[in-house]
Amino acid sequence: GGVRVFVGVTRVLTIDLDDLEAKADLADVLMLSHMRGHICDMDSLMAICEAAGIIVIEDCAHTMGAKWGDTFSGRHGVMGCYSCQTYKHVNSGEGGLLICDDDEIMARAIILSGSYMLYGKHRAGPPIEAFEAVRLVTPNVSGRMDNLRAAILRPQLRQLEAQCAAWNDRYHVVDQGLAQVAGLTRIKRPQQEKFVASSYQFLLLDWPAEAIKSVLARCLARGVELKWFGAPDPVGFTSRYDSWTYAPSSAMPKSDRILHGIIDMRLPLTFSLDDCATVARIIAQEVAEEASAG
């Protein structure tokens, strides 16, 4: 029965805190998505939400292993949600996991996941007393993680810190390679953000749609596949709020301007640092060529 209220995005690809503060009296819960690994000023966000009595749930699908300051992503809000789907920081093909310090919320989550009345066997769950008030009023939606996926994931968790460092090495090579490209806007990252960059984004801000399509086609012809959030129809994983007909929203022109210019690229660990330098060089050449033609 909840009603969704969308909050805008800034040109550094994080939640617009001014817009959040303006809409703070319209909601009780903030589902905060650290999309593509970009973390906002979490100190300011939590101050806004605490003042308004808003519960924060963090979608950390792209920030597992990252930090804001000294706090791991997912530990600011009441709950952190992590994806284990393909291309995420740990990969079991599908599924995910939650972390939470609130016994009642976690008890509800365990029963929702499909524990039936076997919740007492959950070795990471809260005390058994936490289930008494919720066990008969919480439906079972069968979203359990099976032991096979858990066995696939546990060794990856031990390697997470090293994997995060390897992704960031690749990010910095690409970022440096795009540092002086006319018409291309890089994303500024604050010092407090200890990010994990398993993907790379840049902006072709205020470019005509046809020019952006031309850059994508030029790069693809040379083996570099880029994704564009500004396409009128959703493609692959790149959808926008105005595509979600199940969740209507009023227009957000400031966010629309940013979304129109976002270009997105995965940084797989199968790429060597030399590969990343080559990719950056191709993007730089094709963006510069299109910019000069326009």
Where do the model's predicted regions map?
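Active-site phosphate-binding strand-loop segment of PLP-dependent enzymes
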Residues: 11-92, 97-99, 103-105, 264
